[in-house]
Structure formats: structure tokens, C-alpha cells
Amino acid sequence: ADTDYKANFSPDFTDPKTYVGVNPLETTGKWVEAAASKGYAALLREHTADYTSLFGRVSLSLAGDQASADLPTPERLERYRSGASDPGLEELYFQFGRYLLIASSRGGNLPANLQGIWHNNVDGPWRVDYHNNINVQMNYWPACPTNLPECVEPFIDYVRALVKPGERVARSYYNARGWTASISGNPFGFASPLNDESMTWNLCPMVGPWLATHLWDYYDYTRDTTFLREVGYDVLRSSARFTVDHLWKLSLIHISEPTRQEAIS
């Protein structure tokens, strides 16, 4: 499947099509035709080669026993909930999480949202948006430590798409330089607090800097100086400017004005 969405890091806020790209009917049709011409066996080989090139980079051994490994997973889960030790199940969950991220967050696509990319409803919980107050960050905490930096690329693009609208938020709400965002986000550059919700939980000015730290983490693991020079540094510098302006001098120290991160408060 495809959509007409395109990432735009310099959006024109007067243009209703500033986030419109390809015709999804054309691209989807071409993909379906190409897939049908290859046949199932070839597609399975391509799929296996694609995900194993990432999945096979990391192994985890917690010395699980074979008897537990031979049990059906639902039974293992029930036993685990009852207090049984099953290190092998923990290994399985570790790799299951990596597989889900590999399958839901690849270059050129949108990042994993509150439901990954899967849910069983047309309108999923919380509209399956991006909650910037910990949820979207949690999706990506394991990515670089488990050697999946490529899977972070859609998240980086999501953050980059917040910078220009986030500059407006910084000026309008906080009289600050740089950029920031708030608790809820979407791929269309939505960075302001929700105007129909209470500011007691909705105003999260340090969300932008929190998101920006992921760009530094990506560089810290990859040591990709081209990324830092061409992408990461400008985003980080702008975020740092907002953070500096958000501080208040109190005697000999600087403090942050009150903020809220609802999911971890």
C-alpha cells in the first residue's frame, strides 16, 4: 500500500499540498504488478534476505532450556505470568521487538507510531498518532543498541519535519529561538499544544529537545560525520537554542520553567 504523503522539511504553510507527493494509485499498481510477476517463492527469498540482513546482526543467549522452548508460546506466556522462569521466552521477546521495528520502520517510510503500524481497527487507540512525551521515543530506544540504525531513519525524518513548524511554536508560545514540539504530533508538522485540551498535561516544551537527543544517539552509535554535518547538527543546534532560552537565571544557577511529561509524571 502507499499514500500521497511526502516528507517536507521546509513546508509552505499556505500550500494545502505541501505534504503531497506521488499518486498512490500509480505506485501501488506498479508494486503489485512487480510482485505478481516474481511469484511467491522469489518474494519469500527477497523478504528473508531483506530482514535477515538486519535481524541477524545481534544474538542473545540467556541459557534457556529446551523443554520450555518446545512448548507453544501461549503456554509459555501463561507459565511466565504465573511466576515460572523462562529465559528463553525473554530471548524470544527481545528478538520479536527487533523484528517488529525492522518490519515497521524502514527508510523512506513513516516511523512506528503508538501502534507500530498494525492495529485491528480503522480508527485505532489515540488515533495512532505520535505521542512525543515518551511513547514514540520508547519505540526507538532499542534501535541503535541492538544494531538497527537504519530503522531510526524514518524517526529522524519525523523529527526534521517538526523543526520549521516547531520554530513557530517556540516563538509564539515561549518567545524563544530554535524549535520545539508538544505532546501530540503527526507527519504533517503538527508541533503546537492541543488547543482544545488542558495545558496541565498538554504543554510539554521540553519534548523538542528530548526528540532531538535521538539524532545525537544515532550519530553516537554510527559515527556518521556526513549525517552530523548535513542533517543532525542544525537540528541539534536549533534545539539547544530553544533550551537555553527556556532557562531562567536564579541567583547563580539556571533552572527550567515548569514543564510536563504526562506519561512519566
Predicted feature descriptions by range:
Residues 86, 198-201, 265:
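Active-site rim elements
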Residues 236:
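Conserved functional hotspot residues or short segments at active or partner-binding sites
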